């Protein structure tokens, strides 16, 4: 009986091995090894070409001699892709497939902005990333910088701790972590004018954004561009009848999940289960997160008009945004105006243009200071046993119950307002002197005014505030003047040799933090 069982088991195992061998043989015969060489139209090998079986992750890459090898079934499709060349798809019907890729003329002839002028992408040897308007992020963004999030390799954007702020910290890969603030920031250029604030540009007015890195940025703009350059090109008017465009959106923000905190009833049940008495239980069951937060709404409107003739074109736009914060007492509103006009003369050899940008931003915020006077901390740590107001209608302030101030008191009695006014005007001239030789001149003036208002009412719980209220106002003004003139010579000889020379002069004067500050207190009333 035992011998019969062993013999049957051996026969079953032999059959299983035979089936596995046949299956592996079938797969081996189904998978063809395809080899070949990928070249350009002149026959030069192309290293680094991606060879991929369409619809799968099965792929390979060409070596320094343009050769590749890949296992793929007959009848499947191979895709050959390489930067600057059009992608080819070939159905596998033989074991050797040699491919000649054609240059993507559209991609190579794409014009990119490099600072003092522009070049076709095929002539650029440095790292430049271009993001067109239709590829920018879509959403309720307060800063144009946020439109680039996730679009540029190595670009990190950190939003201000105030969610309604128009300021975002930007760093490009390679910037030193030992520095902070403006020392980490890239250099901004708007419509060819260096050092222009991004707050003067409405996201809807952006045509494209070019990001320059490595030696190109420093060679053009010097050490101030050591962290890279972000070049913003705005939309311009075109010849034709006037066109009016209106766009708008409405959005809502809400905190999806808060920290899980003990309610007052949870705390009382815990005390009862563990046989201890809670001191300072005022019978309330306050959800401070719910009291402090809200559903916030944002609405944005943009109106633009553009048009022109064969000689003259113009563009004007107005953008208005109003954004609430999810924390009560926080909000911002912003108004941006822009006007541009350009005209041609001397048989189109002379181009004159003027540009004017202005913005006003108001930002209301709440106390986010130290451990005891932060609304964000207090809404999580203030005792749920305490009501919002006492029996007399005053904000509760029970020393010993919580080390924080009443968060609703800080929102309503400690007020912070920040206003920014910015204006920038530019005049440009460009003259084609002879074939290939062009003269350019730019004059720019930028004025930025900052106002900080801080008012603590007589009902403020802050210990440093005087009995009858305290107010602080600070204002500063920054001025920037820029004049640049340069000659560009760009000539191609015999359709093969290309010569480019740039000679220029740049002057810049900046005055920062010119202002005053004042603190007053002991008011008659809070009006």
Where in this protein do the model-derived segments appear?
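Surface-exposed loop/interface segments of Gram-negative outer-membrane beta-barrel transport/assembly proteins
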Residues: 238-285, 326-327, 336-422, 440-527
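Active-site and adjacent substrate-binding regions of carbohydrate-active enzymes
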Residues: 436
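Short, small/polar-rich motifs associated with maturation and membrane association
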Residues: 1-339, 344-345, 350-353, 357-359, ...
């Amino acid at each position: 009986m035992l011998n019969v069982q062993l013999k049957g088991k051996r026969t079953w195992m032999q059959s299983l091995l035979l089936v596995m061998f046949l299956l592996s043989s079938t797969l081996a015969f189904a998978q063809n090894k395809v080899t070949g060489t990928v070249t350009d139209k002149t026959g030069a090998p192309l290293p680094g070409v991606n060879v991929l079986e369409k619809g799968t992750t099965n792929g390979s890459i060409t070596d320094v001699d343009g050769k590749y090898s890949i296992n793929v079934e007959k009848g499947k499709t191979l895709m050959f892709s390489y930067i600057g060349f059009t992608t080819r798809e070939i159905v596998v019907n033989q074991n050797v497939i040699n491919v000649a890729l054609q240059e993507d003329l559209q991609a190579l002839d794409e014009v990119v902005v490099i600072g003092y002028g522009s070049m076709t992408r095929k002539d650029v040897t440095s790292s430049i990333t271009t993001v067109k308007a239709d590829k920018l992020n879509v959403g309720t963004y307060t800063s144009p910088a946020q439109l680039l999030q996730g679009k540029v390799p190595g670009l990190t954007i950190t939003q201000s701790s105030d969610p309604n702020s128009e300021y975002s910290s930007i760093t490009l890969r390679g910037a030193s972590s030992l520095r902070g603030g403006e020392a980490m920031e890239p250099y901004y250029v708007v419509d060819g004018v260096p050092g222009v604030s991004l707050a003067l540009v409405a996201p809807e007015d952006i045509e494209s954004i070019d990001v320059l890195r490595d030696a190109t940025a420093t060679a053009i703009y010097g050490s101030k561009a050591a962290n890279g350059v972000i070049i913003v090109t705005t939309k311009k008017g075109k010849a034709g009848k006037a066109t009016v465009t209106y766009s708008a959106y409405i959005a809502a923000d809400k905190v999806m999940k808060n920290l899980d905190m003990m309610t007052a009833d949870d705390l009382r049940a815990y005390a009862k289960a563990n046989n201890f008495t809670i001191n300072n239980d005022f019978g309330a069951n306050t959800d401070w997160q719910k009291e402090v937060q809200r559903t916030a709404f944002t609405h944005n409107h943009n109106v633009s008009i553009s048009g022109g003739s064969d000689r003259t074109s113009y563009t004007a736009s107005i953008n208005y945004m109003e954004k609430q914060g999810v924390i009560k007492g926080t909000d911002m509103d912003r108004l941006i105006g822009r006007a541009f006009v350009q005209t041609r003369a001397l048989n189109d050899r002379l181009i004159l243009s003027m540009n004017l940008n202005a913005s006003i931003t108001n930002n209301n915020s709440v106390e986010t200071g130290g451990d005891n006077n932060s609304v964000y901390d207090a809404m999580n740590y203030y005792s749920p046993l305490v009501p919002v107001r006492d029996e007399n209608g005053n904000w509760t302030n029970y020393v010993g119950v919580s080390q924080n101030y009443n968060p609703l008191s800080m929102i309503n009695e400690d007020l912070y307002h920040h206003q920014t006014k910015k204006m920038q005007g530019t005049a440009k001239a460009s003259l084609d002197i002879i074939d290939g030789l062009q003269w350019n001149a730019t004059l720019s003036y930028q004025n930025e005014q900052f106002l900080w208002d801080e008012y603590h009412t007589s009902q403020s719980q802050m210990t440093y505030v005087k009995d009858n209220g305290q107010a602080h106002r600070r204002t500063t003004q920054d001025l920037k003047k820029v004049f640049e003139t340069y000659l560009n010579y760009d000539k191609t000889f015999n359709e093969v040799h290309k010569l480019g020379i740039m000679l220029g002069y740049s002057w810049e004067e900046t005055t920062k933090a010119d202002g005053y500050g004042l603190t007053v207190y002991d008011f008659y009333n809070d009006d």
